[in-house]
Each structure stands twice: as C-alpha cells, then as structure tokens.
From Swiss-Prot:
Belongs to the TRAFAC class translation factor GTPase superfamily. Classic translation factor GTPase family. EF-G/EF-2 subfamily. Catalyzes the GTP-dependent ribosomal translocation step during translation elongation. During this step, the ribosome changes from the pre-translocational (PRE) to the post-translocational (POST) state as the newly formed A-site-bound peptidyl-tRNA and P-site-bound deacylated tRNA move to the P and E sites, respectively. Catalyzes the coordinated movement of the two tRNA molecules, the mRNA and conformational changes in the ribosome. Residues 8-290 form the tr-type G domain. This is Elongation factor G. InterPro entries: EFG_II (IPR041095), EFG_III (IPR009022), EFG_III/V (IPR035647), EFG_IV (IPR047872), EFG_V (IPR035649), EFG_V-like (IPR000640), EFTu-like_2 (IPR004161), G_TR_CS (IPR031157). It comes from the Bacteria. GO terms for biological process: ribosome disassembly. GO terms for cellular component: cytoplasm. The lineage of its organism: Bacteria, Pseudomonadati, Pseudomonadota, Gammaproteobacteria, Moraxellales. GO terms for molecular function: GTP binding; GTPase activity; guanosine tetraphosphate binding; translation elongation factor activity.
Length: 712
C-alpha cells in the first residue's frame, strides 16, 4: 500500500497549555473543523472527545495525552490535503511527565493561552520543556470572548515571562462580548466567521475603520520579523518597503522552524472563532517530519556509535514507544511515533532496551478513544500497536537487522508517597495487577513494598497524581482499597569523608564465615555526577580477592535502600573499598556482602549524616488584599519567598520555595484565607537538608520503633 499523504504534508503537533486556557475545547474544534467529529463536545458538559477517561470528564482537566489523526486543506481549501496528528497534553503540574513525554515525539507545538489569565505558571514549565527539545511553536490566545480578555497584554507577557519572541499574524476585532473575528495581517483583510454554521463558513471583509492603524502597525512588525529571515528578504524589504504574501510566509516559516520567533494568533474556541485560521498556521509555519533534525540514537556495536535516522520510508524501521494505555476491549495499546521506515501488521520488531523481539498484532490509528484498524505505519506516523507485551514507555522499537537505541526519556523521581491496603483478600491480587499496569503506563508513578511494614507504597509527583491513580484503580480494575496519609519521600546523605572497618567472623563447627573490609565513604554531588551512588576499589596486592568486590558493593547498596538515620533511601555517597583481609576456606560472597553492609552502617553514622527533604516551587496568585496573610502563612510553613510579580487586575503572583512536608492541606487553608479567590501551582524543585529540629523529630520516631513517614 503506497503512502496516502506525502511526508512533507504531515504535521505532528502537540497542543499544550495551562489548566483552563481552553486547550481541550481548542482540540475539539480542530476535530470538528477537520471533519472528524460531527457533534462538538463541550468540556462544560463533560462530553469532550479528547478527555476520554471518566476522571478527566469529572474534573474537567486533561490527564493523558490522547493522540488523534485528522486532515486539513485550509479554511478556503487553499492547500493540498495535509495530515495533522494532534497530541492533547495535560496542563496540570502533577502531569508534567505527560507533557515531557509528548514533547519528545512532536515536531511542533501550539501553545494555548487564556486571553484573561495570560501566561500562567504552568505555561512557563511547558515552555521550558519545549525549549529543552527545541520544538518550534506557535501561540494561540484563546477565550477572547471572556470579560477581561486582552490579546496585546498576552503578547507582552510572552516577552517578559517566557523570554519569547511573539509575532502576531492576526489582531482581534473587538474583545469580550464584542469579539467578532480577526484581522489577518498577511492578507490585510478582516475574517468574520459565520455563527449559524458553527464557524465552518467564513468571509473576508474590509478592516473596521477604527482598527486600520493598529493593523498597519502590527503588520509592519510582522513583515520586519519575516525580513530578518535572510539577507535576500531584508534587501527586498528595504528596497520595496513591503514583502509579498509568499515572502512573508517563507520568512516567518524559516524563523519559526529555527525557534527564533513564535507566530501568534487569537480567537475563541468555545465561540467557534479563530481555530480555523490557527489550523492554517499549523500548515504554513510548523515543520513536517523531514524539516526537523533527524532523530539520533546509538548503534548496537562495541563503541556505541552515534547514528541518526532520516524521516524516510526507505530507511530501516525505528520508532519510540511514548505512551502505554490499557484499553478494556483490546488490552495493552502502545502508542508509537515512527521516525523512519515502514512497519506492517504481523511484522516482528526488536526492542534493544529489553533485548527482546516482539510481533505486532494489530495497528490502530486513534481518534480520541475510537480506533480504526490500519495495515501499516510509515515514517512520521503516530499510531498505537496492539499485542506488545514487554514494552515500557520510552523504549525503542526497531528493525532487528538494523538495531538502534533512540535516546531514552528522563523521568523524575516521585516526591510523595502513601500506603494502600486492599480491603479484602480478593482485592489483593486485583490490586497488584492494577498497580503493575498503571506503573507501566506512567513512569513517574512507582510501586514498592515496604520491607518493615509489608505495606504496598505508591509514589508519585503530587497529591492530585496519586488521587487519580487510586481513582483509576477503583474504576478500571474494581479494586477497593484503604488509603493511608500522604508521606514525604525523605532521603539520607552524608557531609564528610570517613574510613570504616567492617568485619564478619563466625566460627562454628565446620566451615565458618569470614569477611573483612575497610571502606571509605565520601559525599558525592548527585547533580554533577549524574548518579546517586558510586562504587570504586583501590585494593592493592589482592588483600580482598577480586571476586568479592561485587559482593561488597551489593552489601552497601542493600543497606542504602533503608537508610541508617530514619530508614529512608541513602543518596549522594561514593564508597571506596581500599583494604581488608580474607580466609582461604571461610571467606565467601555472603561474608563480604555482610562486611560491606556493616562498614557502611557504622561509617554512615560518623560521616555527619543528614536528612534531605523535597522542596517544592510554589506560585500563588492572589488578590492584593490577601497578600499579607498568604505571605505570613508561607513563612510559617518554612517557605522562602523568592519574588513577586504584579498581574493585571490588582493580582499578585508570589513565588516561593516550600518544603513538601509543610504543603499538605495547603489548598484548603489558602482558599479560606482568600475567600476562594487565590490559586496556586506547585512542582518539585530540589532536595535540601532538613533543619535539625524537624529532622530530630522524624529520627526519634523511627528509633522509637515508629514507622518512617509517620511525620504527621
């Protein structure tokens, strides 16, 4: 089967934004105008097509990025048909992992901002992620029909808050309830959408007289931005004082692809205005898979040679599994982005991360949660495969004759954990299956069993993250469970270098045990080293035989899992085995493993041990009247205020760093202090030393036989 759409007419885009900027509604409209969905779904009724998990519809927020394929030929059918793969990404900080994950597989992004709220904290997080993956993007200012809407203020905020370089190619006609359409600065005509056809039809008209000057000023700004793309365009502009439509589009496109500018549009998705022009901009300014840098990976050879894969059907097959979802009808769905080559139904693929080959059962193209079976996928495609058993998020799938491992995704460690206990014996097995599946879908969610208490501990990126996991466990898998209080994921580390002996000698009749080591423990800078633990040996003259080095390392690592101070995992330690002795008959692996463990346990307590706690970056937006109370409350929570910004409408944004331990129940307290008018967002910033008075309480509880984490 030949390719239906040339790869140059593909656009793989993500739509991402702050909560409530109207992102899901925008995506809904895209599906409506491109003819995929015949009834517009409204988030207000809980019927939006992209928000297809029940929890999303109830909470009105998007949690999992659904991938959808649609086709567009332009508002006035002025383009050949293009295929647009849209990935809807969540806007809540607890789900930043989903955004990070989709940024990896996108070629371009559309950032949606609220015309009233402007650039909010989450917008900055998403912007940083897009910068990290060098994703070309355009901006769409939504909700132009809302009271307080101001397009030009958002343009300013993009410059000041994001350090962006926005170039509007439309300006709004009216705002709030007088918002009727936009002036297209490239055509220099007004676009008015027909309300009866829900915006399917539109007409070009004259620019309203009171907008002519504004439109001219912003057009000049746009043409200058386009002219800066090349010397040739600049010369043309200086000679003629203007550029043709084709030159403007070519110039803006070149600069958008280089991430030098962000083309900016506006509209109201809810009122069916502006999204159509934004779709045209996706075709005009965002890259096809052939226009972004070829994906890089590592070949399967001794030297781990770096290589790249061109976006072409002729190249060997390579793809990245960027999302795994459980579907109650077909089982595991693995979403893949194909970078090169062709994959047909029934083909075998190789997963170099797991060293396994698997056969593809079915291939389906998703439209939100409806699926269509297809026979093959080619370079540039995004689709889901059915029947892959051992693939986890971030794995590479490739041709087994041309093995390549694409760059892995990085997933942050969880900062909050809680205990879950099944209510009945029957729930026990269901719970472990459910948690296993959910952890496979979401790499920022972890599950482990606490060795001392035997409890199942789940860990994630925030309270909302874990709430939703527990909720899904109940709904999708029918598991009834009791939920413990949230606990902070503390860590332990050392501040000075020590040398310590560790010895195990047992003489009982027959073969005894003998292991004897000297270990040096040194503080390790986790950020600089890029790892939490390092083992080295400086043994001279075979005083400890080589075959026992691994056992010593293992003994230390096992002891680090449940730290010495308060039972929390130890990080930031370099252990060096430098001396010891052995016995010809009695020495074995177990003896040296125990000796290593003892040396670590005793040395750790002498090396200035400290407890580390997760510190969160908190941003509170509050009306000025409540600022004093909110600042005072943050200080009481051991918060450090980092700065303040003035927002429109007498609102202040307070940025602070606050220990996670002090943030439980913050939402309720903040609401009552501000009569429900303040909002906040929170994301993990770093680990820092816990103040002595706080740490002493946690350690005393642990030593008195209390369970770790009972820091309430």
């Amino acid at each position: 089967m030949a390719r239906q759409t040339p790869i140059t007419r593909y656009r793989n885009i993500g739509i991402s934004a702050h909560i409530d900027a109207g992102k899901t509604t925008t995506t809904e409209r895209i599906l409506f105008y491109t003819g995929v969905s015949h009834k517009i779904g409204e988030v207000h009724d809980g019927a939006a097509t992209m928000d297809w998990m029940e929890q999303e519809q109830e909470r009105g927020i998007t949690i999992t990025s659904a991938a959808t394929t649609c086709f567009w030929s332009g508002m006035g059918n002025q383009f050949p048909q293009h295929r647009i793969n849209v990935i809807d990404t969540p806007g809540h900080v607890d789900f930043t992992i989903e955004v990070e994950r989709s940024m990896r597989v996108l070629d371009g992004a559309c950032m949606v901002y609220c015309a009233v709220g402007g650039v909010q904290p989450q917008s900055e997080t998403v912007w940083r992620q897009a910068n990290k993956y060098k994703v070309p993007r355009l901006a769409f200012v939504n909700k132009m029909d809302r009271t307080g809407a101001n397009f030009f203020r958002v343009v300013e905020q993009m410059k000041t808050r994001l350090g962006a370089n926005p170039v509007p190619i439309v300006v709004p006609i009216g705002a709030e309830d007088t918002f009727t359409g936009v002036v297209d600065l490239i055509e220099m005509k007004a676009i008015i959408w027909d309300e009866a056809s829900q915006g399917m039809k539109f007409e070009y008209g004259e620019i309203p007289a009171d907008l002519v000057d504004t439109a001219q000023e912003w057009r000049t700004n746009m043409v200058e931005a386009a002219a800066e793309a090349s010397e040739e365009l600049m010369d043309k502009y200086l000679e003629e004082g203007d550029l043709s439509k084709e030159d403007i589009i070519a110039g803006l496109r070149a600069r958008t692809l280089a991430s030098e500018i962000q083309v900016m549009l506006c509209g109201s998705a809810f009122k069916n205005k502006g999204v159509q022009r934004m779709l045209d901009a996706v075709i005009e300014f965002l890259p096809s898979p052939t226009e972004v840098k070829a994906i890089e990976g590592i070949l399967d050879d001794k030297d781990e040679t770096k290589a790249s894969r061109e976006a072409s059907d002729e190249a060997p097959f390579s793809a990245l599994a960027f999302k795994i979802m459980n579907d109650k009808f077909v089982g595991n769905l693995t979403f893949v982005r194909v970078y090169s080559g062709v994959l047909k139904q029934g083909d075998a693929v190789y997963n170099p991360v797991k060293s396994k080959r698997e056969r593809i059962g079915r291939i389906v193209q998703m439209h939100a949660n409806e699926r269509q079976d297809i026979d093959e996928i080619r370079a540039g495609d995004i689709a889901a495969c059915v029947g892959l058993k051992d693939v986890t998020t971030g794995d590479t799938l490739c041709d087994e004759k041309n093995i390549i491992t694409l760059e892995r995704m990085e997933f942050p460690d969880p900062v909050i954990q809680l205990a879950v206990e099944p209510k009945t014996k029957a729930d026990q097995e269901k719970m472990s299956i459910a948690l296993g599946r959910l952890a496979k879908e979401d790499p920022s969610f972890r599950v482990h069993t606490d060795e001392e208490s035997g409890q199942t501990i789940i860990a994630g990126m925030g309270e909302l993250h874990l709430d939703i996991i527990v909720d899904r466990m109940k709904r999708e898998f029918g598991v009834e469970a009791n939920i413990g209080k949230p606990m902070v994921a503390y860590r332990e580390t050392i501040k000075k270098t020590v040398e310590q002996e560790g010895k195990l000698v047992r003489q009982t009749g027959g073969k005894g045990k003998f292991g004897h080591v000297y270990v040096r423990l040194e503080p390790l800078d986790v950020e600089a080293a890029g790892k939490e633990y390092e083992f080295a040996e400086e043994v001279v003259g075979g005083v400890v035989p080589k075959e026992f080095f691994g056992a010593v390392d293992k003994g230390i690592q096992e002891r680090m899992k449940n730290g010495v101070l308060a039972g929390y995992p130890v990080v930031g330690v370099k252990a060096v085995l430098f001396d010891g002795s052995y016995h010809d008959v009695d020495s074995d692996e177990l003896s040296f493993k125990m000796a290593g463990s003892y040396a670590f346990r005793d040395g750790f307590m002498k090396a200035d041990p400290v407890l580390l706690e997760p510190i969160m970056k908190v941003e509170v937006e509050t009306p000025e009247d409540y600022m004093g109370d909110i600042m005072g409350d943050l200080n009481r929570r051991r918060g450090m205020v980092q700065g303040m910004d003035d927002l429109p409408g007498g609102t202040k944004a307070i940025k602070a760093e606050v220990p996670l331990a002090e943030m439980f129940g913050y939402a309720t307290q903040m609401r009552s202090m501000s009569q429900g008018r303040a909002t906040y967002s929170m994301e993990f910033a770093k680990y820092a030393e816990t103040p002595r008075n706080v740490a002493e309480g946690i350690i005393a509880k642990f030593q008195a036989g209390g369970k770790k984490g009972d820091d309430e």
